[in-house]
A protein has these predicted regions:
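Conserved G1/Walker A P-loop phosphate-binding module
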Residues: 1-74, 85, 91
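C-terminal-of-GTPase-core extension/linker across diverse P-loop GTPases
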Residues: 2-5, 16, 146-351
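Extended, highly charged alpha-helical segments
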Residues: 119, 124-163
Length: 364
């Protein structure tokens, strides 16, 4: 699940509407998004259409991820300003963040701080996330102090908590914090810190800045430099244009993008990047009834991947017949791939790769 965050009036809800076509109320005033709007978004994957043609399939089922449009944040959110407490509670529930940053001038759309400054806006939100995390760490530290004297494990955790807190107090994000060992890593992940969640920046621009990916937009360049230091990705989008594209059918959309000099929409890139940011990949199953992308975490072994289809497949797993999508395309048919020795039998320890086409064998 990804949370779309940003200051009020930066284009969050417009972007969310484009992603989900959900029609979330998008108004030119702060806090028009009070309850988070949730939408399930399909992940673009051209491989499914190709397999669909190969197998003359009746149904194509793409992978999907969930996006949540979270209320606009303001300074002082960690102290309850605006919808701060609600915002922070909502964002704690997501796995990763799409941070929408305003990089366009428009006198008709008010900015809460009265001027356009993308880095200031990013840092405003980061500070509120930091303050919220520090507050949470302080509560944990207060509890740990009471028992640390008589419990070595708690004493060790207390030392970690204090190190993380000191790190955040330097206005740094927990995702760049360095742990000393695997135990500390497990603890760090268990705290569900807002500043530990992975982030993608969506630089929202005007139509004029789209064709050259915001190369002439100083705000976009500043965001890219900032993101590089934070080891985050940046995608240039025009939320208004994306909303228009979302209303078109496939042929119209293709023509529209060609007119803009684009191969794919900014949102398609953003969705794919978001899927990857969550550490997700797709393996594929194909046949006449359906072609489907199954979502798994990177590093998932074959039995657990099989369990995504049905729990019986995981319990009774023996082996899987696997061919990579690229090998299948090169050979033209599954039979030809098998004749060339490109279809492999893999056992319980096999780690499934993105684009693997699988056929499972289990006890009869």
């Amino acid at each position: 699940k990804l949370g779309i965050v940003g200051l009020p009036n930066v284009g969050k809800s417009t972007l969310f509407n484009s992603l989900t076509k959900a029609g979330a109320e998008s108004a030119n005033y702060p806090f028009c998004t009070i309850d988070p709007n949730v939408g399930v978004v399909t992940v673009p994957d051209e491989r499914l259409n190709v397999l669909g043609e190969m197998y003359h399939t009746k149904k194509i089922v793409p992978a999907a991820i969930e996006f949540v449009d979270i209320a606009g944040l303001v300074k002082g959110a960690s102290k309850g300003e605006g919808l701060g407490n609600q915002f922070l509670a909502n964002i704690r529930e997501v796995d990763a963040i799409v941070h929408v940053v305003r990089c366009f001038e428009d006198s008709n759309i008010v900015h809460v701080d009265g001027s356009i400054d993308p880095i200031r806006d990013i840092e405003t939100i980061n500070l509120e996330l930091i303050f919220s995390d520090i507050e949470m760490l302080e509560r944990r530290i207060a509890k740990a102090v009471k028992v640390a004297r008589n419990d070595k494990a708690v004493a060790k955790e207390l030392e970690l908590l204090e190190r993380i807190k000191a790190y955040l107090e330097e206005n740094k994000m927990a995702r760049s914090f360095t742990v000393n060992d695997e135990d500390e890593q497990v603890l760090l992940e268990s705290y569900n810190l807002l500043t530990y969640k992975p982030v993608i920046f969506a630089a929202n621009v005007t139509e004029d800045d789209l064709a050259n990916d915001g190369a002439d937009n100083e705000g976009v360049q500043a965001v890219k430099e900032y993101a590089e230091k934070e080891d985050c990705e940046v995608f240039v989008v025009c939320a208004q244009i994306e909303q228009e594209i979302a209303e078109l059918d496939d042929d119209e959309k293709k023509m529209f993008l060609e007119d803009l000099g684009l191969e794919e929409s900014g949102l398609e890139k953003l969705i794919k990047a978001s899927y990857s940011l969550l550490g997700l990949i797709s393996y594929l199953t194909a046949g006449e009834p359906e072609v489907r992308a199954w979502t798994i975490k990177k590093g998932t072994k074959a039995p657990q991947a099989a369990g995504k289809i049905h729990s019986d497949f995981e319990r009774g797993f023996i082996r899987a017949e696997i061919v990579s999508y690229d090998d299948l395309m090169e050979c033209g048919t599954y039979t030809a791939a098998k004749e060339k020795g490109l279809v492999r039998l893999e056992g319980k320890e096999y780690v499934v790769q993105d684009g693997d086409c699988l056929l499972y064998t289990s006890p009869s």
